[in-house]
């Protein structure tokens, strides 16, 4: 970080909206945030207590739930503060740096994790007899660890490139969170080279993972079509459909914001809300409503709680 950085704080401009919508938006985002945290905590609890869910797929799902819970926590509380407190828009320089780092750290890790999960589904469906020998506990741990390390490296690049520049004013960030593109507009130096590097790195990570995921699912579909029983086909399609829905909702808005030419604040703001506020909620919703094993485990947990309370 340069010594020429004179700013000690930034002001988040928040979402572009009419002031009369402050209270309704606060209520909606608060409800979504609480549901996101509770929903993902519930998935973690159910998988933890039900031994039938101690499988590779659910091991990666616990990582995903943990990421989504904290991904939402990094952005939504500050967004809520900007809606109800005049002073809530202010964020210190170092807090802004931390928010950018963890935003990209968790987002990048989730991106890599989706790639790993697609490989896991491919191996499970295409090589069912060899699957357990290939996806051992050690292999799963190494894969999960690699996603977290890759996300950390990706985020460190974003943070270092963004905050080594001098910032001497103005300090109004045209966003509701600290992200590289709006922050770079405030730098007191030429940012064209850094913007290009960030664009390329985000593009390689997001587009690369997405393309590899698509290729995995093309191979999965080909493998499913070779399954002889209709019940086997239906179960395989159902399992993969849940993952595909979450993947599309995660990558779609992200690619739209970072890789499209030009920028419109209102459109970017709405898409960013979907990406940072609503997408983390989709994980518990999709994986509980569409997954029979998780629903069965939830019912068992409910019965256990009811039985313990009746004693």
Swiss-Prot record:
Annotated disulfide bonds: 96-188
One GO MF term attached to the UniProt entry: G protein-coupled receptor activity
Pfam families attached to this UniProt entry: 7tm_4
A single cellular component GO annotation: plasma membrane
Keyword presence, Membrane: yes
Extracellular side: 1-23, 74-98, 160-196, 258-268
Segments traversing the membrane: 24-44, 53-73, 99-119, 139-159, 197-216, 237-257, 269-289
Coiled-coil intervals: none
InterPro entries in the record: GPCR_Rhodpsn, GPCR_Rhodpsn_7TM, Olfact_rcpt
GO biological process, one term: detection of chemical stimulus involved in sensory perception of smell
Keyword set, alphabetical order: Cell membrane, Disulfide bond, G-protein coupled receptor, Glycoprotein, Membrane, Olfaction, Receptor, Sensory transduction, Transducer, Transmembrane, Transmembrane helix
Topological domain ranges for the Cytoplasmic compartment: 45-52, 120-138, 217-236, 290-311
Localization (cell): Cell membrane
Glycan-bearing residues: 3
PROSITE patterns the UniProt entry points to: G_PROTEIN_RECEP_F1_2
Family, per entry: Belongs to the G-protein coupled receptor 1 family.
Known function: Odorant receptor.
Full protein name: Olfactory receptor 10G8
Gene: OR10G8
